[in-house]
């Protein structure tokens, strides 16, 4: 049962075939065109174009049928038409869709079928005597055009809708010489024409060898004498398959072959259709059985039992062209035409090009280029010299910066990597011959076949700039991991040293003693010199240099800031918070590094070192806030979790050991963990020392000259043993200014500037100070002040006193040191300090200090005293100690414990 659409198409094709048959019949019989009825010529004239039959002498219509007598084509027509020759064979030529006059219309009814090729006309070849005429020039069309089924004894065009039984019954009529329209069918000797075989061989050349059917029970040997049947479909399809995946496989012998036997046989191979066509063929003897081929939803082709030595192939296209040209125009003999105009359009998309004829027959190469062949050429391995020029705009060299298109060249494949080809279609990549040739190279031992690294030219197009960016990223990641492994190695070495230190213990008591830093300082040294620096570097790795702060804007980050941020109030970190508070209250630990070390010592004491590191790694927000993505803890949290696991495994043995470490061990033992102390700079060379001494001596003489003592200093230096030294000059300058005198050492002049001259500084000052007050030259002092830019008179009042200072104590005073030097000491109002210093030596023995607290001497050279006692000052040792006496006893007294008695 046909669908409505296919039934409509069958009816339309049937009507069209009737019109074509009528037109062909009228073109062969011009006398019938004068009227609807005509008298046929005498029956003896066999060379005419009239039909011959039992209706001779009666009026017939255009179909040679009597209007009074119903036509019984299978019973009443005589056998005389068997030897009748159709003269139209001489003027019929094989038409191809590629003919210049008809290439625009492939078939007059091709638009009736939306998805199939047009149906061929069924004509029946009748057996008869050999005709004197050679094989007609009608040859099968190219494989893309509709062909005649060439089945012997096919039915009339209305067989589209008939059943196999009716067709077989019609084919077994006693008079098979006429068709359903009472038209004589031409007979011809079955002589294979060279053109036919050549065309068949060319058709065979297009068949891919991968689709040939294997030998089965339906395959027939060409040497059999018994006639066999070949079932040709209603229409033929080009062997180059379309997108709908129609696949037709034919044997290499598709035509009529003459094997030297009188009764020629038909040789057939079962044809396979991927889109649902199934043709069932069976080998039968002549006159035995009829085969029916099922074609796509009920379209059938019926085969007669009788093999005939001749076939006439006619297509819709040929009939339409003869009808257009008219009966008077002879057909031009067909030559081999270029069918690229319609072959390219209908060329299917196949995976592989045709690989030659299966039967071994060699045919000349076709000059037609199809899309399939172009695709096959592009997939084939390129020869050393390219067979054709590359398209315009393409380049076989690395592209320059201006042109954006990238050449479709093969990328360089590293050993062991899959080659990647660009510029090809997906199916081309799948079956690329070049890829198949290079595939064995990827299976070499030791090759990394699992990686695919794509290399591309740089944007600048410079060959030297070609880099594997992914390989670089992998190498960078590898270097980063190696760096982190180095941090873990340092931790591992330190842990091994600590464990080896405890390995000397034989019992738990000895282990406890070895873990106590007071009993065994070596463990403290080991922890501070090996483990603490390793953990400090680990925590500081990848740490951001600054941390945002609400008040100061940013604070410098350090491992101790990580400790501060990680210790939060909570149940799990309560003990850690207690330890953090304890370390923070240790005043001697001023640097963040020493505090971090003390925190590590406390973690070892409480066996929480592993706990703190695990809690630090679990806090993702803290890590993102404090660390860069390349830091150790960031990598351990993200891409390399094995780092954190390995760190915890390394620290796990320390949780078993017992430690009693002093948190101030570093402060007490002064370990050289900080920056080493800079060595004392070497002293100046002797020449420089002499120069400096000479300059200082000149300064002393200048001061003496300003104070009127130049006469005394003018004497020979060897004669005066009490020559003022550079220290005495500076002492005099300090005494004159009274600015550099310390409050704690007030009354003990020049103790800061002459620490090595404990007993002689005050004596020399006492001997030299009275001289400037007595013999001071006012002009000399004014000259020195003007030399240094000190203002003159406005700095003094009428009585010589200084002006009062400004009310604000924040403002600088109006008088300077050089102004005091210029003015000198006023003679009418000497200060009490100057009076005390200018007193004779016996007066200085009465200078005393009062004790502020009780003090017990710690050494024999110190003096013990009680609070409130008055001690006699003998001399000043340095800025911290005084030599005092009490009740006939002398000793050292701290300056801070006394106050000066005025």
Curated annotation (Swiss-Prot):
The lineage of its organism: Eukaryota, Metazoa, Chordata, Craniata, Vertebrata. Residues 277-289 have a biased composition (Polar residues). Predominantly expressed in brain. Associates with the adapter-like complex 4 (AP-4) and may therefore play a role in vesicular trafficking of proteins at the trans-Golgi network. Signaling adapter which plays a role in neuronal differentiation. Involved in regulation of NGF-dependent neurite outgrowth. May play a role in neuronal vesicular trafficking, specifically involving pre-synaptic membrane proteins. Seems to be involved in signaling pathways that are regulated by the prolonged activation of MAPK. Can regulate the polyubiquitination of IKBKG and thus may be involved in regulation of the NF-kappa-B pathway. Residues 94-112, 249-261, 433-450 have a biased composition (Low complexity). The RUN domain is necessary for NGF induced nuclear redistribution. PANTHER family: AP-4 COMPLEX ACCESSORY SUBUNIT RUSC1, RUN AND SH3 DOMAIN CONTAINING. GO terms for molecular function: actin binding. Phosphorylated on serine residues following nuclear translocation. Polyubiquitinated; polyubiquitination involves TRAF6. One of its GO terms (cellular component) is Golgi apparatus. It comes from Homo sapiens (Human). The gene is RUSC1. Residues 291-309 have a biased composition (Basic and acidic residues). Associated component of the adapter-like complex 4 (AP-4). Interacts with IKBKG and TRAF6. Interacts with F-actin, acetylated actin, TUBB3, STX1A, KIF5B and KLC1. This is AP-4 complex accessory subunit RUSC1. It is found in: Cytoplasm; Nucleus; Cytoplasm, Cytoskeleton; Cytoplasmic vesicle. GO terms for biological process: protein polyubiquitination. Pfam families: RUN, SH3_9. Residues 381-390, 398-407 have a biased composition (Pro residues). It comes from the Eukaryota.
């Amino acid at each position: 049962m046909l669908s409505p659409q296919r039934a409509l198409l069958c009816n339309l094709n049937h009507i069209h075939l009737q019109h074509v048959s009528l037109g062909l019949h009228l073109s062969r019989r011009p006398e019938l065109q004068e009227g609807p009825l005509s008298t046929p010529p005498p029956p003896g004239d066999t060379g005419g174009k009239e039909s011959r039959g039992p209706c001779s002498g009666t009026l017939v219509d255009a179909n040679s049928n009597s209007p009074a007598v119903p036509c019984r084509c299978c019973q009443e027509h005589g056998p005389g038409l068997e030897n009748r020759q159709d003269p139209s064979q001489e003027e019929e030529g094989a038409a191809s869709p590629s003919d210049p006059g008809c290439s625009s219309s492939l078939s007059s009814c091709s638009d009736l079928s939306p998805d199939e090729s047009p149906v061929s006309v069924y004509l029946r070849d009748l057996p008869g005597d050999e005709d004197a005429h050679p094989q007609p020039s009608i040859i099968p069309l190219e494989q893309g055009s509709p062909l005649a089924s060439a089945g012997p004894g096919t039915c009339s065009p209305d067989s589209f809708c008939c059943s196999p039984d009716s067709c077989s019954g019609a084919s077994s009529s006693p008079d098979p010489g006429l068709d359903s329209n009472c038209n004589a069918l031409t007979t011809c000797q079955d002589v294979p024409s060279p053109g036919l075989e050549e065309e068949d061989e060319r058709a065979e050349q297009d068949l891919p060898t991968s689709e040939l059917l294997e030998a089965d029970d339906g395959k027939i040997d060409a040497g059999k004498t018994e006639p066999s049947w070949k079932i040709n479909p209603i229409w033929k399809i080009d062997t180059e398959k379309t997108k709908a995946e129609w696949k037709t496989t034919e044997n290499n012998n598709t035509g009529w072959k003459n094997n030297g036997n009188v009764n020629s046989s038909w040789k057939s191979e079962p044809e396979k259709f991927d889109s649902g066509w199934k043709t069932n063929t069976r080998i039968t003897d002549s006159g035995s059985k009829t085969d029916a081929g099922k074609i796509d939803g009920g379209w059938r082709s019926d085969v007669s039992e009788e093999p005939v030595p001749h076939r006439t192939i006619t297509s819709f296209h040929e009939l339409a062209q003869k009808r257009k040209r008219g009966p008077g125009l002879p057909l031009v003999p067909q030559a081999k035409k270029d069918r690229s105009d319609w072959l390219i359009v209908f060329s299917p998309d196949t995976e592989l090009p045709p690989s030659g004829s299966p039967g071994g027959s060699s045919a000349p190469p076709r000059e037609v280029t199809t899309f399939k062949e172009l695709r096959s050429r592009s997939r084939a391995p390129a020869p050393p010299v390219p067979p054709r020029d590359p398209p315009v705009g393409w380049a076989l060299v690395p592209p320059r910066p201006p042109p954006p298109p990238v050449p479709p060249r093969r990328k360089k494949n590293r050993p062991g990597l899959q080659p990647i080809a660009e510029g090809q279609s997906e199916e081309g990549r799948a079956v690329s011959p070049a890829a198949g040739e290079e595939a064995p190279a990827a299976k070499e031992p030791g090759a990394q076949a699992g990686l695919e690294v794509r290399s591309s030219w740089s944007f600048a197009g410079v060959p030297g700039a070609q880099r594997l960016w992914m390989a670089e990223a992998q190498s960078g990641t590898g270097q980063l991991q190696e760096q982190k492994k180095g941090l873990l190695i340092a931790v591992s070495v330190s842990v091994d040293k600590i464990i080896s230190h405890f390995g000397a213990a034989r019992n738990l008591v000895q282990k406890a003693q070895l873990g106590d830093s007071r009993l065994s300082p070596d463990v403290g040294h080991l922890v501070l010199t090996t483990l603490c620096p390793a953990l400090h570097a680990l925590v500081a790795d990848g740490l951001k240099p600054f941390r945002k702060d609400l008040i100061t804007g940013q604070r410098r980050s350090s491992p101790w800031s990580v400790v501060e941020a990680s210790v939060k109030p909570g149940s799990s970190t309560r003990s850690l918070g207690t330890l953090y508070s304890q370390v923070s209250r240790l005043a001697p630990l001023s640097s963040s590094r020493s505090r971090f070390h003390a925190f590590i010592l406390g973690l070892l004491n409480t066996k929480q070192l592993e706990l703190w590191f695990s809690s630090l790694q679990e806090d993702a927000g803290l890590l993102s806030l404090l660390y860069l993505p390349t830091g150790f803890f960031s990598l351990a949290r993200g891409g390399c979790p094995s780092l954190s696991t390995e760190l915890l495994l390394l620290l796990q043995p320390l949780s078993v050991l017992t430690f009693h470490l002093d948190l101030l061990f570093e402060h007490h033992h002064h370990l050289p963990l900080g920056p080493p102390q800079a060595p004392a700079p070497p002293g100046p060379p002797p020449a420089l020392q002499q120069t400096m001494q000479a300059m200082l001596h000149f300064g002393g003489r200048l001061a003496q000259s300003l104070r009127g003592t130049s006469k005394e200093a003018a004497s020979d230096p060897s004669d005066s043993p009490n020559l003022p030294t550079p220290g005495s000059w500076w002492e005099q300058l300090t005494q004159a200014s009274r600015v550099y005198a310390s409050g704690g050492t007030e009354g003990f002049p020049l103790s800061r500037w002459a620490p090595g001259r404990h007993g002689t500084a005050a004596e020399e000052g006492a001997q030299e100070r009275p001289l400037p007050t007595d013999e001071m030259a006012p002009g000399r002092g004014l000259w020195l002040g003007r030399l240094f830019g000190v203002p003159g008179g406005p700095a003094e009042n009428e009585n010589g006193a200084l002006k009062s200072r400004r009310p604000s104590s924040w403002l600088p005073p109006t008088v300077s040191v050089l102004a005091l030097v210029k003015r000198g000491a006023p003679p009418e109002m000497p200060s009490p300090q100057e009076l005390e210093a200018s007193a004779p030596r016996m007066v200085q023995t009465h200078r005393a200090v009062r004790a502020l607290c009780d003090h017990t001497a710690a050494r024999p050279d110190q003096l013990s005293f009680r609070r409130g006692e008055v001690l006699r000052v003998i001399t000043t040792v340095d800025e911290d100690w005084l030599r005092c006496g009490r009740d006939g006893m002398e000793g050292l007294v701290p300056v801070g414990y006394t106050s000066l008695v005025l």
